[in-house]
Amino acid sequence: DTLEYVEKNIQKVSDADFVTLPEMFCCPYEAKNFPAYAEYEKGEVWQACSLMAKKYGVYLSAGTMPERDSDGKIFNTAYVFDRNGSQIAKYRKSHLFDIDVKGGQSFHESDTLTAGDSIAVFDTEFGTFGICICYDFRFPELGRLMALKGAQAIFVPAAFNMTTGPA
């Protein structure tokens, strides 16, 4: 079970202040899978991440997960939890990754995901941080906007691979 694996590994590094998980850590990273794995905010995966942050006393940048909203739209959403398990940030990926690699892989997040339209910045005792997701990082304006809101560093949960990374 993925959540058991995540907890086992958070336990190994529980003396850390921050733990970060990868993009779509809780489901196979294929656009066709996102609807089946999508949960409403505060669903099972969200609850588990909140509990792990509290149990191990860490800030948890909980990678990303497919989030379904009340209109049925699905977003690639990142949540950040503080040491008490409280959600302190939520960010929905705004730059969806659509690619057709010549002679190779084809992947279109926009087939199933909806783009977000906000930025996320959060405060900790270590400073102010921003969060964006994977392909978003290639758009410097997003980082600039986070910096203008006080972000001193940016978390970037990502799932680049050897094919999509250079693309």
Predicted segment positions?
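Cys-nucleophile CN-hydrolase/nitrilase-fold catalytic domain and related Cys-dependent amidase chemistry
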Residues: 3-84, 90, 99, 161-167
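Structural motif
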Residues: 17-18, 129, 153
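Active-site catalytic loop in hydrolytic enzyme cores
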Residues: 69-149, 157-167
